[in-house]
């Protein structure tokens, strides 16, 4: 098997960060400028397309040769570009993505950052001149007197820069190959590689968009925003009432109190007070209305929609690399607002018809309504329907199975009412009494918040963050809820401490330790310079924790840490973890593997997935004769027993319709 490593430099007038790679590549002015390649580790060669060079015949043939694996960093981009160049969709099975391989091994997405994290020598690292060269040659430039009014820079405008750009192109191939060599000690399992290939196809399919809905929402949103801003200026006299600094200063002068920011929760708490002046109350209401992110999502859809009315590239495979879950991109479908508005069809018609007054009269807050309708902008293709199916309480099922908490598993095998069952176990009340007609039903709220907050070693702070106080639960009751939940779930509690102890053992002593259905191990390769704590999941996939260490935490106990990407600062740094967090990683990773397997089965059954969100899949397909039969087939596939997780009770539910919603 031959290996062809590739890196492309390209031009397009479409901004790739906002529009996505597929729309970028579909632009009429898109072109490949440079094509660097290396066969089987040879010195990289740069083919200068921009100056008339043509790709050697053997390279073009290699792009189609099943006996030649193509490697690239962020390979979906090269795959898309070269599929257009070759005039056909290249077989995904012939491609390998080094960026994904790095994410699989616990590193970051960036080529330079991953190279540094792996400790690549200077001559193997990405050149730091790249960003400036890309800005100069790969995107349009602003016309000026100095550049003769041109809107694009060509090689002849800066020959020395162009030669440096070619060197940069070749060096990216060198860096990619060195990273792949270092990662060869931790190969990607074949079934995970197949999932990557399926993801490539799903992202290239895209999702149909109701542009009438999007355009109507943008127009109505702008009208409402202008109206509210004008009103806010009139009330406050501020030049820019959307400015946090200006509004906070005004509120301080009106209330005589210090205002520490205007976050969503802060504004909500201030609105709940009964001593606000009418002016303050109205300004807070306007702030809350203007704070809706609805039009931002519609803006993102409009910027990313391709010529055929579909948005592509909504998901990044292994984007959440601590668990291997997908991450949302462009429109961020992973965090769309829920849909409570009813009837949805009427609301959508009013938005498409720009009926602002009617929308306000029937549904109240226009920004809130537009926010709830974002999901419905994703529609079935003409003549098709959407099938939506999602796993039921997947994380609660997985942690119950992993810990062997039998009473919980029995709940999921039968009625599935985990909130009621949890309250029953915690407070010793028969579950039959926990229903709306009885006073015991109040215990369900405590069971619910406990289930949502405490599964991963959370305590009273986790209950507060999950909204326990907002539910009316007194703060003094929280320690009792924590204690009762842990006593009712002894096997889950024990799992946290067993995993913590196993991690400490393998890091300090080496070897491997099995806990339930997972295996923790310390793996290193001196020749490649890699050092990991790994957790082998029941599926066979591994989670990687780079450069693990044991220190001492603030309570004087052993502290587990590893090198990883800080989700807040986006910097590579040492991160502390503990048993409950490791259990959370495992549970979410196992749930992810259940979803990935379901997607493979759905695809094999001729049910084309267009996107998915955590535990939910969306299919776009020609309707069957019977909608119920379509849904039943999908749910049956989602609920199939998992071979590597015997006894894990999966369940799913869903709907069939013309547009996306949260049922």
Name what the model sees in each region.
Residues 183-195, 594-617:
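Active-site palm subdomain of RNA-directed nucleic acid polymerases
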């Amino acid at each position: 098997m031959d290996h062809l490593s590739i890196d492309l430099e390209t031009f397009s007038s479409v901004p790739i960060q906002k529009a996505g790679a597929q729309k970028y590549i579909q632009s009429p002015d898109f072109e490949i400028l440079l094509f660097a390649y290396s066969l089987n580790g040879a010195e990289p060669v740069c083919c200068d397309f921009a100056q008339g060079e043509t790709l050697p015949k053997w390279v073009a043939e290699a792009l189609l040769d099943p006996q030649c694996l193509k490697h690239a960093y962020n390979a979906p981009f090269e795959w898309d570009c070269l599929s257009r160049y070759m005039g056909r969709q290249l077989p995904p099975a012939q491609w390998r993505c080094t960026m994904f391989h790095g994410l699989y091994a616990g590193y970051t997405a960036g080529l330079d950052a991953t190279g540094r994290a792996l400790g690549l020598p200077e001559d193997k690292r990405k050149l730091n001149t790249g960003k400036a060269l890309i800005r100069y040659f790969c995107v349009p430039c602003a016309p000026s007197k100095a550049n003769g009014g041109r809107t694009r820079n060509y090689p002849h405008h800066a020959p020395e820069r162009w030669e440096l750009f070619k060197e940069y192109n070749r060096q990216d191939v060198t860096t990619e190959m060195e990273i792949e060599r270092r990662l060869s000690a931790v190969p990607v399992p074949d079934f995970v590689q197949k999932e990557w290939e399926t993801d490539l196809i799903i992202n290239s399919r895209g999702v149909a968009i109701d542009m009438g809905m999007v355009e109507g929402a943008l127009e109505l949103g702008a009208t409402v925003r202008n109206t509210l801003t004008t009103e806010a200026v009139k009330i406050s006299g501020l030049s820019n009432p959307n400015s946090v600094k200006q509004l906070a200063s005004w509120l301080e002068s009106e209330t005589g109190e210090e205002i520490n920011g205007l976050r969503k929760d802060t504004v909500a708490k201030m609105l709940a007070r009964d001593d606000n002046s009418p002016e303050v109350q109205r300004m807070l209401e306007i702030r809350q209305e203007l704070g809706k992110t609805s039009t931002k999502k519609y803006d993102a859809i409009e910027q990313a929609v391709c010529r055929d009315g579909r948005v592509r590239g909504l998901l990044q495979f292994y984007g959440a690399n601590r668990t291997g879950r997908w991450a949302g991109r462009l429109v961020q479908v992973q965090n769309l607002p829920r849909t409570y508005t009813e009837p949805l069809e009427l609301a959508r018609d009013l938005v498409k018809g720009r009926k602002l007054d009617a929308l306000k009269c029937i549904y109240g807050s226009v920004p809130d309504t537009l926010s709830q309708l974002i999901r419905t902008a994703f529609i079935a293709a003409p003549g098709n329907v959407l099938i939506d199916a999602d796993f039921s309480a997947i994380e609660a099922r997985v942690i119950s199975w992993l810990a062997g908490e039998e009473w919980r598993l029995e709940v999921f095998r039968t009625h599935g009412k985990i909130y009621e069952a949890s309250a029953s176990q915690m407070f010793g009340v028969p579950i039959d009494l926990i229903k709306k007609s009885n006073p015991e039903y109040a215990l369900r709220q405590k069971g619910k918040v406990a289930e949502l907050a405490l599964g991963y070693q959370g305590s009273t702070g986790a209950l507060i963050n999950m909204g326990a106080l907002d539910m009316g639960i007194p703060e003094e009751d929280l320690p009792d809820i924590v204690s009762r939940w842990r006593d009712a779930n002894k096997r889950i509690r024990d799992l946290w401490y067993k995993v913590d102890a196993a991690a400490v053992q393998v890091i300090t002593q080496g070897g491997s330790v099995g806990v339930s259905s997972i295996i923790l191990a310390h793996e290193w390769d001196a020749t490649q310079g890699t050092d990991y704590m790994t957790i082998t999941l029941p599926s066979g996939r591994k989670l990687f924790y780079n450069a693990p260490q044991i220190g001492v935490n603030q309570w004087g106990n052993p502290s587990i840490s590893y090198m990883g990407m800080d989700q807040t600062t986006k910097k590579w740094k040492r991160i502390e973890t503990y048993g409950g967090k490791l259990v959370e990683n495992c549970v979410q990773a196992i749930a992810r593997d259940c979803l990935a397997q379901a997607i493979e089965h759905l695809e094999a059954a001729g049910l084309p997935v267009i996107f998915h969100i955590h535990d939910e899949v969306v299919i776009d397909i020609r309707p069957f004769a019977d909608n119920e039969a379509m849904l039943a087939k999908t749910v049956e596939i989602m609920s199939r027993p998992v071979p590597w997780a015997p006894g894990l009770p999966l369940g799913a539910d869903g709907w069939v319709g013309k547009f996306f919603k949260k049922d």
